[in-house]
Structure formats: structure tokens, C-alpha cells
């Protein structure tokens, strides 16, 4: 029996599969760009596969969702440092809108939350989130399993669920676990920057290895960590927004007890570590810094402090001076509400994509 010749598909038939004939080409280019940047997008998270390094076999998951401090920009940078320079697999999850673009003003979503199922440590830059049950259940499971928590800036007030929510106990996650809740802007917001000053009593703590010069253009938060916390850095309030500015000199009242003190005597803590013991007996290692805008992470030693915090939280030897070089030029956006870049997908924030 003679086989009928195969007729070439008509243009109309091809258009059923590819309405835009160039679309496969552009999809290929997009995939190639992600591969070249060392990232891949999977189920809404951006994942950086591990290169050689001591972190090989460990997965660090970054959770972003703050309206002001451009966590969507700095978390991928930190994640790529850990994967490229230290051998950790890292994933970054974002707050996204209905169209899948990154939108930190949406406080109910966490793209790629499945990454939490294999997390060995969790880095958070969150502010008053009310995640959906699926994402919250994954976070709850990882936290209750004792996964370490590295908390940045507004993560002192990470969650804000209504009283009717089964997750409302997480509204105290800042005070109970991170080590402080939201209290106040101790320095004048957007007017007085922060210089990190090492706490002499813990100057030899491994998280401070190689850390000598921390500066951030965010202000100092008022904070009173619990007695079991080891304070690593205090925040000197500066007179202006430049690293060369002198310390501020004036008095103000503390929000907690209305007692007046010099703004820098004593200085407020801006970084600490602690062990949080759950009622189940499980213990989480916790590293917290109330610094942490994208612009703050222009400071090499602040990046090093956080990388060291990841090592310490996982019980690993902290390098003498961790490599925290960024991929290409890191030009973070200035912090502020409604300042997030519009129309970008999670993969667009991977360093090296040029977005």
C-alpha cells in the first residue's frame, strides 16, 4: 500500500500553534538569558543553581514582600552571591500581582512558595504580609522544623493577619522570634543615615568576621532585643546621609517608656543573633539586622554580614573574609513607597538580565 505523501502544513495551521511566528524565537532568547545569568524560573521563584563552594548541597530560600525598601532588587543580588561565590543553591520568592508581575504592594501572595519545602535556611525581607494558606502553611512547616531565619529590616513586623485568621499568632513573629517588633524610626527617616558600630562584647563573634565598615542610608530603628540576644552591631545616627557625616547630637524620648536620652547614648542595636526555642523543643538559629534596604546593600560589609549570618545559622565555618562581590554593577533604586519597577516578572530581577 502506497503511503500518502505528507503535505506541508499551511500557514493557517501553523498559526494555530504559534499565532506569532517569532514567539518561539523570543522564548528561546528569554530562556537563554536566564541560563547565562545563572538563574532559572520555576513556579514563580527564581533559582540560582549552586556553583562550587562550601554551601554545596544546601538550599537557601529568600522571601520578599515589602513595599518600601526594594527587597525585590536586593534579595536576588544576595542570592546570587551565595550561589556563585559560596556554593549554595538559592531561590527567591516574590510578592506578585494577578498578572504575575512583581508587586510588593500585594501583601497576600508569595510566588514560588514550593521552594520552602526544601529550604535549609530562610532569608526574609517582609512587611505586614497576609499570605494565602498554601504559602503560609509551607512557611509554618519550615519554621517549625527549626530552619534558621535571617531577618532583614522590616521583618521585625513581617506579618499582619486579621484576628479571624488561623495564622494570627504570626503577628508576633517579630517580637517572639526575630527579636523585636516595629517600634519607631529612631533616626530621622530619609534625613539621618546609619553607621554600624561593632559591639565590643561580641567583637569576635563569627558573624562579624571581615566586617569593619558598615554604612546604610536608611535610618536607625528603635529596637530592644531580648536578653538572650547577642548584639553584634549598634547603629550610630548620623547628621546627614553620607558616610562622612558626623554623629547626630540631640535628645529624644524612647517610644517604649518616654524616657529622654541622647540619640546615640546608648546607640540602638541594629544587628543581633539568638537561638529561639519553640514549645516543641525545636530551636531556630536567628540572625537579625534592622538595616537592609537595597541601597544599604551597596555597603560591601553589610552584604558580608548577611552572608556570614547564613553560614553561622547553618552551623558552618564562617570565612575569614567572605567574597561578596556582585555580578556586574549593582545600582539599587532609592527606597520609598510606590517605588517598585512596574511590569517586571520575577525572572527579570535576576542579576545580569539588565532590567
Model-derived regions, located:
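Extracellular ligand-binding/catalytic regions of CAZymes and related secreted enzymes
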Residues: 42-55, 74, 84-85, 241, ...
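Short alpha-beta junction capping motif
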Residues: 59-65, 115-164, 289
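Glycine- and acidic-residue-enriched helix-capping/strand-helix junction motifs
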Residues: 65-80
Amino acid at each position: 500500500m502506497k503511503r500518502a505523501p505528507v503535505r506541508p502544513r499551511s500557514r493557517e495551521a501553523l498559526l494555530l500553534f504559534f499565532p506569532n511566528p517569532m514567539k518561539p524565537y523570543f522564548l528561546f532568547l528569554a530562556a537563554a538569558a536566564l541560563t547565562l545569568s545563572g538563574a532559572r524560573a520555576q513556579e514563580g521563584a527564581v533559582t540560582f543553581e549552586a556553583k562550587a563552594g562550601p554551601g554545596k548541597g544546601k538550599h537557601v530560600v529568600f522571601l520578599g514582600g515589602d513595599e518600601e525598601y526594594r527587597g525585590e532588587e536586593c534579595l536576588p543580588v544576595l542570592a546570587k552571591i551565595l550561589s556563585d561565590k559560596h556554593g549554595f543553591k538559592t531561590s527567591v520568592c516574590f510578592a506578585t500581582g494577578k498578572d504575575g508581575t512583581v508587586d510588593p504592594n500585594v501583601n497576600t501572595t508569595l510566588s514560588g512558595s514550593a521552594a520552602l519545602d526544601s529550604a535549609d535556611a530562610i532569608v526574609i525581607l517582609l512587611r505586614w504580609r497576609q499570605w494565602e494558606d498554601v504559602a503560609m502553611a509551607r512557611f509554618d512547616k519550615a519554621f517549625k522544623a527549626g530552619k534558621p531565619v535571617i531577618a532583614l529590616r522590616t521583618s521585625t513586623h513581617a506579618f499582619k493577619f486579621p484576628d479571624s485568621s488561623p495564622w494570627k499568632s504570626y503577628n508576633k513573629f517579630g517580637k517572639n522570634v526575630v527579636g523585636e517588633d516595629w517600634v519607631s524610626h529612631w533616626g530621622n527617616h530619609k534625613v539621618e543615615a546609619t553607621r554600624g558600630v561593632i559591639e565590643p562584647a561580641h567583637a569576635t563573634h563569627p558573624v562579624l568576621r571581615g566586617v569593619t565598615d558598615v554604612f546604610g542610608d536608611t535610618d536607625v530603628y528603635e529596637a530592644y532585643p531580648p536578653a538572650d540576644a547577642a548584639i553584634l552591631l549598634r547603629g550610630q545616627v548620623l547628621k546627614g546621609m553620607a558616610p562622612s557625616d558626623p554623629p547626630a547630637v540631640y535628645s529624644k524620648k524612647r517610644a517604649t517608656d518616654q524616657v529622654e536620652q541622647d540619640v546615640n547614648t546608648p546607640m540602638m542595636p541594629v544587628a543581633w543573633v539568638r537561638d529561639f526555642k519553640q514549645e516543641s523543643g525545636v530551636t531556630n538559629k536567628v540572625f537579625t539586622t534592622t538595616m537592609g534596604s537595597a541601597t544599604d546593600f551597596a555597603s560591601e560589609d553589610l552584604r558580608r554580614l548577611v552572608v556570614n549570618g547564613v553560614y553561622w545559622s547553618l552551623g558552618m565555618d564562617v570565612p575569614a573574609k567572605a567574597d561578596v562581590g556582585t555580578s556586574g554593577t549593582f545600582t539599587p533604586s532609592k527606597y520609598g513607597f510606590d517605588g517598585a519597577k512596574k511590569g517586571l516578572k520575577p525572572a527579570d530581577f535576576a542579576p545580569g538580565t539588565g532590567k
